[in-house]
Amino acid sequence: MKIVTINDSVSLKRDLDTGTDMQQNAVHSIIAQVREQGDQALFTLTKQFDGADLTTLRVQQAEIEAAYREMEEPVLQAIGEAIENIRDFHERQKRNSWMTTKSDGTILGQKITPLDSVGLYVPGGKAAYPSSIMMNVIPAQVAGVQNIVIVSPPQKDGSIPAGVLVTAAELGVKTILKVGGAQAIAALAYGTESVPAVDKITGPGNIYVALAKRAVFGHVDIDMIAGPSEIVVLADERANPRYIAADLLSQAEHDERASAILVTPSRALAEEVAVEVDQQLTTLPKREIAAASIRDYGAIYVTETLEEAVSVVNELAPEHLEILAEEPMSFLGKIRHAGAIFLGPYSSEPVGDYFAGPNHVLPTNGTARFSSPLNVDDFVKKSSIISYSKAALLENGAKISALARLEGLEAHARAIDIRLEDER
């Protein structure tokens, strides 16, 4: 793992993967096919891309029951407890509608309304993460969304992984559909005979899913276009190098393009961590993926001081930030840009991925400078409420008309003037 002495500013930001022309054209063609042919396109494309010859898209109750039989009790219990923790955290994010009445009788306020429907994309195969179902479904449920649809590509035998089905069932999601890729996004956006159109699409996916989400955005809402996973560890000389190496590798195994970075003022710690990473890599099942990530996107930045290390962290604006230093809570006020902040030696990043409660759908590619983790607010709309009294209009009408005429909008001004004239 390369060790770099910090001289200039650093950045995790990369060019967003907007796909090749061929990929973009393929996605637009798939979307058009789904809009024109509906379910028939989904069956055709699922056979073409996933090798599954389906006669129905909807997961049946018998399949869910079979999935439960595959699950060991300790895993089922862990899923249940994780759901509890995540729900409890997101319940604290709920907002209420409000109204206020001014002295002149004017009533102003904000009305909170949940979205009618949401579609969650769950990747298939080895990337079929039940934890992502919890993190996307629970804030939507807490927000009050009534209709939640899960789509996921089937395996060649037409099945969906047991972990996905059981987690969805534990959350009470009734509509689970066997369709993936750009065609699933198109179906959620525009609807087919079997797939209900939704108002918002969330969830991770490959480049074709990302391009499809970008293409349908505006017709429906989406969560974000997420990049590869990132972790930055801020550590002082007292930190445990074995813990740091393990946590860096926990993100590196996700993807060859994942970023794993240590920032520290301690050259000795940097060298120990580099050795530990090499040693721990040798026993990882996904060592080839992790090794490529560490080689191409991993680094250890050595700074002069801990204060300089904090500045580097804010420049990086990482998805995940671990603080392994004495009195980690004291750093919290200094961190301005990070998707999730893990404090202390026992707050390893997987604690947040699976169990603690905060959402693991986080901003990447430096976008933590201006965006937030997925949360309950992402599944509601806010409507402004205005009830102007006669007294308020008489007092302020001339000012409103003046502002309208300043902008050259005479009809706006007259809409006010006509009411003022009636009251004279």
Curated annotation (Swiss-Prot):
SUPFAM superfamilies: ALDH-like
Pfam families named in the record: Histidinol_dh (PF00815)
Any Gene Ontology biological process: L-histidine biosynthetic process
Catalytic activity: L-histidinol + 2 NAD(+) + H2O = L-histidine + 2 NADH + 3 H(+)
UniProt binding sites for NAD(+): 121, 183, 206
Molecular function (Gene Ontology), one example: NAD binding
UniProt xrefs under CDD domains: Histidinol_dh
Active site: 319 (proton acceptor), 320 (proton acceptor)
Matching InterPro entries: Ald_DH/histidinol_DH (IPR016161), Histidinol_DH_CS (IPR001692), Histidinol_DH_monofunct (IPR022695), Hstdl_DH (IPR012131)
Pathway: Amino-acid biosynthesis; L-histidine biosynthesis; L-histidine from 5-phospho-alpha-D-ribose 1-diphosphate: step 9/9
EC number per UniProt: 1.1.1.23
Annotated binding of Zn(2+), by residue: 251, 254, 353, 412
Cofactor binding, note field: Binds 1 zinc ion per subunit.
Keywords: Amino-acid biosynthesis, Histidine biosynthesis, Metal-binding, NAD, Oxidoreductase, Zinc
Required co-factors: Zn(2+)
Top-level EC class as recorded in UniProt: oxidoreductase
The protein's role, per its UniProt record: Catalyzes the sequential NAD-dependent oxidations of L-histidinol to L-histidinaldehyde and then to L-histidine.
Membership in a protein family: Belongs to the histidinol dehydrogenase family.
UniProt name for this protein: Histidinol dehydrogenase
Encoding gene (name): hisD
